[in-house]
Design a protein with these regions (language model features):
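Rossmann-fold NAD(P)H-dependent dehydrogenase/reductase core
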Residues: 2-132
């Protein structure tokens, strides 16, 4: 198995090589939140640039998390995209359009892109549908 210091060194090398653009769906709690915080910490103050689009339902949760992430990565951009329910394809289409527009505006002469996509939104109910 790869040793943890080797993983940390590799991650640091990625961030020092070029700016990173990431999209997180489900980063306002749970695994997505922990992964976002780890990304901000790995980038830290030595990375070439970090821009993260965070899809979520609640702006309040986003603001709390971004406050912490901004301390870990003061040069990072953390952008909230309101997304009420990503289990509905219409909402997914709307979120994608908003991300595309925002990234084209924020790329500032660079190629608009997404380097990393982390999707951990929602939950799964093994008991079946409970709405009726």
């Amino acid at each position: 198995m790869v040793q943890l210091p080797t993983v940390h060194a590799h991650n640091a090398a990625i961030f020092q090589s070029r700016p990173i653009v990431a999209v997180f769906a489900g980063a306002t709690s749970g695994l997505g939140e922990a992964t976002l915080r780890a990304l901000a910490a790995a980038h830290g103050t030595n990375g070439k640039g970090l821009r993260v689009y965070i899809l979520g339902r609640k702006r309040e949760a986003f603001q709390r998390i971004v406050s912490d992430c901004s301390r870990l990565c003061p040069t990072g951009q953390f952008i909230f995209i309101q997304s009420p329910d990503l289990s509905l394809l219409g909402n997914v289409d709307k979120a994608c359009a908003e991300i595309t527009k925002a990234e084209q505006e924020n790329a500032k002469g660079e190629q608009a892109r997404i380097d990393l996509l982390c999707m951990s939104q929602g939950d799964f109910n093994f008991d079946g549908y409970q709405g009726m």
